[in-house]
Amino acid sequence: MAGFAGKSTFAFTVFDDTDGSTLENVGPVYTCLSDLGFRTTKSVWPLPLVAAHTSGGSTGATLHDREYLKFVQRLENEGFEIALHGVRNHDSTRDVVERGLQIFCDRLGHYPRTHTNHYRNRDNVYWGTGRLASAAGRAAGRAWSFFKRTAPYEGHVESSPYFWGDICKQHIEYVRNFTVDEINVTRVNPTLPYHDSAKPFVNFWFTSSEGADVGSFCERINEASQDRLEAEGGICIMYTHFSEGFSEGGTVNPRFKSLLRRLSRKNGLFVPVAELLDFLRTTRTEGNIQHRELASLERRWLKYKLRYPRSR
């Protein structure tokens, strides 16, 4: 893709899912990112954890933890974006969502611009089979949901107590939907970010490159992939959990650090997710995704999801 700002020939950024994040396990990672000139996006939970639902990734620090809040505020002051990953680690009715968003605003001085749904929260917007538009995709999604026994997702269902779609549309500019096994997301989703008229409560969607933990992240941005991203003039929005193996005992994973250092020496645009998506919108006049592109994107995601169920 041509037309990046300044001398940049490609773009790279990261959306960090807050699951499991603490000051101790992600702090060193952000120091590394900052020192190398990357400005990325970190998500947070504004409300305290629901203790009965802290299994798996549904744990970590929140904006109610004083030292963690100071850390998050410092990151924002340094140019990182702070985004939303739902208002907490469990289901939230409309009033809880409103309270969480207000706390986010009170602590950081503004509402979040970027959001991703959290795992199986019932307040997720267009999640589960709601992510899919094609009939074949929805059928496959329903089969998957049956076998996984997932709960309904109702953040976009106006009759539900979990509805907050109108609030999402009012405050949130960008929501992540699919993750793909590709470093250059514009190869599979050239209309980035995109609006889907079938999902009116989301202003714009974006697609990410899968790299959930340090191993898959490093494999996704290996040397050959970096060079291809640069050669193609592509865009990479990594989706990851910096809490999952990126630092141990205060020391950043050496392979991760080496790959980032190499990438930082290239002529890339290294800005947060919302800033990158804002820029991309200035380069085109049409933001509505066409059926063929969306159907192809869905098929690719479904195939990847079947092979790697943990993918988001």
Model-derived regions, located:
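Aromatic- and acid-rich polysaccharide-binding/catalytic face
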Residues: 198-210
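Catalytic alpha-helical scaffold of carbohydrate-active enzymes acting on polysaccharides/glycoconjugates
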Residues: 1-201, 215-238, 246-312
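Short, glycine-/Ser/Thr-/acidic-enriched flexible segments
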Residues: 243
